[in-house]
Regions:
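Short, glycine- and charge-enriched coil/turn segments that flank and shape catalytic ligand pockets
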Residues: 5-9, 37-40, 66-74, 109-117
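Catalytic beta-strand/loop cores that center a nucleophilic Ser/Cys/Thr
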Residues: 33-81
Length: 139
């Protein structure tokens, strides 16, 4: 819906996700682990906005480690159909092969008009790295 600056100026959003973000002086910085429909997702957050989801807006994930949207409600990001909004930075797609495969599938389906299943890929090294990150961050 909107972004409200630290000075109180309201800037309209695109209307895709039902979220309102308030700019803050304090930053939320650090590694994040989320529980999502795509499995655990790891990343890094560095933001000063505090985002609140609208009543019917689904979050991208639930915070297992980190601050998330606002440091208090346990949500991170927002998802509507094939749109994901998130504060996560870093190598999000290589670090989360299941999420990457899902996004590739969505894009291919939108491009071709039919469901597309990614071919068999050897994601073993990526899966091991992902599991190591999740385990380390939740320890």
């Amino acid at each position: 819906k909107a972004f409200v600056t630290v000075e109180g100026k309201t800037l309209p959003g695109l209307g895709i996700l039902d979220v309102t973000t308030q700019g803050n002086e304090k930053r939320m910085i650090g590694p994040v682990v989320l529980g999502t429909d795509f499995g655990d997702v790891v990343g890094y957050e560095n933001h000063s906005g505090s985002t609140t989801l609208g009543a019917g807006q689904a979050p991208f994930g639930r915070v297992r480690s980190g601050m998330g949207n606002n440091g208090s409600d346990g949500t991170e990001g927002a998802v509507t159909e094939h749109v994901i909004g998130s504060y996560l930075h870093g190598p999000i797609l290589p670090a989360n092969p299941r999420l990457a495969d899902t996004l590739i599938g969505w894009a291919a389906e939108l491009a071709t008009g039919r469901p597309v299943e990614p071919g068999d890929l050897d994601d073993e090294v990526a899966r091991q790295a992902h599991t190591h990150q999740v385990t380390r961050l939740l320890a």
